[in-house]
Amino acid sequence: MQRRSNNERLVEYSPYRFDDPQFGHFDGTGQATMSWYIHRFKPFIDRNFRTLPDREHTFIGGSSMGGLMSLYALLQYNDTFSRAAALSPSIWVSPEKLSGLVGRAKLEPGTVLYMDYGSREMGNHDGMRCGFAEMCAKVMTRGIHLTSRIVPGGTHSEASWEKQLPFMFHTLMYEVEE
C-alpha cells in the first residue's frame, strides 16, 4: 500500500480550496473524492456485499479531515447519508463555504449528526470553540438532530477519538423522534 503524505490527504479530503500558513495553498479535490465514493465505490460495495443500501441505513464518519468530509457528505449527499459522525472536523479549512452549504443543503427529515472536538486540540481553543459553536448553531437551525461535545482533555489524535466511539455510536444508532 502506498502511503500518502499529509499534503495529499489535505487535498483529497477538502471539498474546498484553501490556504494554510504552515503548508501553503491546496486545491481541494474533496468534491471529486466524494463523487467517486457516491457514484462508484458505494454502488460496488452494495452490489458485492450484503448491505442495506437505502439512506436510512447509510452512515458516514471520520476524524480531522475525514470529519470535514463526513460533514460535507451529510450535507451535500443527504439523499444518500442519513447520519454522520464528525470527530474533530477540520472546519477551519473553509468555514464560510461550509456554512453556506449548511444553509442551502436539501435535508431530509431525520438527519443526525455527532460532532466533537477536544479541549486540548491544536493550541487555539478559543478560536476552535467559537468556530465549533457557530457551526453547531447553524446546523441546528436546519433541523439536524445534533449531538455535540467538547471533550475535556481531548487531543487531536487517534487515541482520543477512540474514546469517543461510545458517544458517537449512541448518537448514530438511536431512534429519532420527530
Predicted regions and their residues:
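Non-catalytic cap/lid and distal C-terminal segments of serine-dependent acyl enzymes
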Residues: 1-178
